[in-house]
C-alpha cells in the first residue's frame, strides 16, 4: 500500500495470503483493504494518485489454490497480475475480463515468446542476480534479445543494484 501511495507499483505473492480451515479468506481481506486504502488515498490526493498494485500468481499445475485465487483477484479488480511457472491463457482471460493486465515472469526468449503467444500483455525478464530466482542470463543481453521482437511492457529484475544500472536498463 505504501509503495502504491508513493507512486510505485507494489506487489505481493498471492500464496502469502495463507488461510486455515474455517478461517476467513486472507486474500479477500487483503484485497479489500488494499482497494479501500488506495481509493481513500486517491480521493484525498487527486493530484497524486496511487500507482496500481500487482498480485503474483504461481500458475503451475501444482498450485491447488489457483482457480480460487484468480476468482478473488477478478472480483476485487486486481489491476496487475504477475504470473510465473507456466503460461496459462485461461488465467490471462480472467485477468483481462476483470480489466487487469498480465505480466509474465520469463527467464529466456523462448519463454517470453510463449507467454506473449498465450495472451500475456507484458513480460518480467528475470535475469541473473534476481535473488533466488531461476534467471541465468545477463539482464542486458536478455532485454536486447526480447526488444528485437517485442515492443510492449517489459520489466527487468536481476543485477540492478545502483543508479547506473537503472540508467543502462532504461536506455535499452
What does each model-found stretch correspond to?
Residues 1-155:
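Active-site entrance/lid segments in N-terminal catalytic domains of soluble metabolic enzymes
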Residues 167-172:
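A compact, surface-exposed functional segment
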Amino acid at each position: 500500500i505504501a509503495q502504491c501511495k508513493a507512486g510505485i507499483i507494489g506487489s505481493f505473492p498471492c500464496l502469502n495470503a495463507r488461510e486455515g480451515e474455517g478461517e476467513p479468506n486472507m486474500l479477500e481481506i487483503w484485497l479489500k483493504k488494499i482497494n479501500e486504502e488506495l481509493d481513500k488515498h486517491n480521493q484525498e490526493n487527486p493530484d497524486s494518485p496511487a500507482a496500481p498494485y500487482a498480485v503474483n500468481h504461481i500458475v503451475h499445475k501444482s498450485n491447488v489454490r489457483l482457480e480460487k485465487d484468480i476468482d478473488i483477484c477478478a472480483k476485487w479488480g486486481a489491476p496487475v497480475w504477475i504470473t510465473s511457472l507456466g503460461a496459462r491463457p485461461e488465467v490471462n482471460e480472467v485477468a483481462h475480463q476483470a480489466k487487469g493486465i498480465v505480466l509474465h515472469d520469463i527467464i529466456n526468449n523462448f519463454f517470453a515468446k510463449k507467454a506473449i503467444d498465450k495472451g500475456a500483455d507484458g513480460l518480467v525478464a528475470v535475469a541473473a542476480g534476481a535473488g533466488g530466482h531461476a534467471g541465468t542470463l545477463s539482464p542486458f543481453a536478455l532485454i536486447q534479445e526480447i526488444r528485437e521482437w517485442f515492443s510492449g511492457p517489459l520489466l527487468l529484475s536481476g543485477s540492478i543494484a545502483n543508479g547506473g544500472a537503472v540508467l543502462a536498463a532504461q536506455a535499452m
